């Protein structure tokens, strides 16, 4: 069993399949977990951030349901912590029509059976004194959580290794090996590796693997983030507006983000990106104006044409996709691992996934049922 890509998605799938006693080889083009997973802020928010994301909500809710067990298992197998905390989010609305925007969000979340409560600005400021005077309305989202993605990746890779996953660094995959209509392995820069099944979880690099663009037309979307330290501001929970978010870490740092940029594979931090983030941050929490800016970085999210992930079997037997998670890779890791394990082991998952099929981008609309035959 080969997993192509060692980020949070690939590592989670590898661990899940290793638990089922499969021999799993995890291949990464460089060091596992050093791309989008390393750069993420670590917010676990199942609510839709745009109309395009509505089909994702059931999947996100299921992943949130799985998260406590997922974290407990990873931490137990690795002996390491992940920084997971369900501290909730205060969502603030600063526009003149903020109350109307807040009420629309509350109605939408309630219709989707997501926990949310409209709160007054006084209640919001009592909970988080750093909130600025621009706040016109607020909502409390008690079920949302955060973790430290870098700690999670360290724990995941350790857990996978302890379960027998063979982790190969600096192993970029160039193409699939096909025997008729059956994927029988991969071609790396150095060698050929045979396998009964291959799962591609290579994020924004998936489309660059020869022949996979028709299933995984991913593209990089740059996100820049900052880390702040403040002696006068301490947050107990995530603060979020339409312009910025602030995520507290257990080490006292505050992660601020982020940008959404179509900048190709350019991963550097820019003055314009930093300014955009800081403008939103200082409107959200003006007291952070005197904070120390201790770090800045950028990552490449795997975008797709419809902003939805690409999950499941292709029309090539033994070839599966688990990519294109865009801004939701950390959030969707547990449910993605469960779904891919079901496909590989049983042929069919127990969850509606038509929205996410790799075949939605191809001209051929034939079913992938035969191609999804489980490992024998």
Over which residues does each language-model region extend?
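Active-site substrate-recognition segment that forms the wall
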Residues: 12-20, 29, 42-44, 48, ...
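Beta1/beta-strand and adjacent pyrophosphate-binding region of the FAD-binding site
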Residues: 1-9, 25
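C-terminal catalytic lobe of FAD-dependent flavoproteins
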Residues: 149, 285-376
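Dinucleotide-binding Rossmann-like beta1-alpha1 core, especially the glycine-rich loop
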Residues: 42-127, 280-282
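Helical element adjacent to the flavin cofactor pocket in flavoenzyme catalytic cores
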Residues: 139-197
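Residue-level detector of alpha-helix initiation sites
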Residues: 7-8, 31, 327
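Short beta-strand to alpha-helix junction loop
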Residues: 58-61, 92-101, 139-158, 268-273, ...
């Amino acid at each position: 069993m080969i997993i192509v890509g060692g980020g949070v998605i690939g590592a989670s799938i590898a661990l899940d399949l290793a638990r089922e006693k499969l021999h799993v080889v995890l291949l990464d083009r460089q060091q596992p977990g050093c791309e989008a997973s390393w750069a993420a802020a670590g917010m676990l928010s199942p609510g839709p951030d745009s109309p395009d994301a509505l089909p994702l909500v059931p999947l996100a809710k299921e992943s949130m349901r799985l998260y406590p067990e997922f974290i407990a298992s990873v931490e137990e197998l690795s002996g390491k912590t992940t920084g997971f905390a369900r501290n909730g989010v205060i969502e603030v609305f600063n526009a003149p029509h903020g109350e109307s925007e807040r009420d629309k969000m509350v109605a939408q979340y309630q219709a989707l059976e997501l926990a949310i409560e409209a709160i007054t600005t006084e209640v919001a400021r009592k909970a988080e004194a750093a909130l600025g005077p621009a706040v016109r309305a607020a909502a409390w989202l008690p079920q949302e959580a955060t973790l430290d993605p870098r700690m999670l990746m360290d724990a995941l890779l350790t857990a996978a290794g302890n379960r027998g996953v063979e982790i190969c660094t600096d192993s970029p995959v160039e193409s699939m090996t096909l025997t008729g209509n059956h994927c029988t392995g991969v071609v790396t820069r150095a060698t050929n590796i045979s396998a009964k099944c291959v799962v591609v979880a290579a994020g924004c690099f998936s489309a660059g693997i020869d022949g996979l663009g028709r299933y995984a037309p991913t593209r990089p979307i740059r996100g820049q983030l900052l880390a702040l330290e403040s002696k006068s501001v301490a947050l107990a929970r995530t603060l979020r507006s339409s312009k910025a978010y602030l995520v507290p870490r257990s080490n006292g740092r505050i992660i601020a983000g982020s940008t959404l940029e179509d900048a190709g594979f350019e991963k550097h931090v820019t003055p314009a990106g930093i300014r955009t983030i800081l403008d939103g941050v200082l409107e959200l929490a003006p007291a952070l104006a005197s904070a120390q800016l201790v770090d800045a970085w950028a990552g490449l999210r795997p975008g797709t044409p419809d902003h939805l992930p690409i999950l499941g079997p292709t029309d090539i037997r033994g070839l599966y996709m688990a990519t294109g998670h865009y801004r939701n890779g950390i959030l969707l890791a547990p449910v993605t691992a469960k779904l891919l394990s079901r496909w590989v082991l049983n042929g069919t998952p127990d969850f509606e996934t038509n929205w996410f099929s790799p075949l939605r981008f191809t001209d051929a609309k034939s079913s992938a049922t035969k191609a999804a035959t489980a490992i024998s």
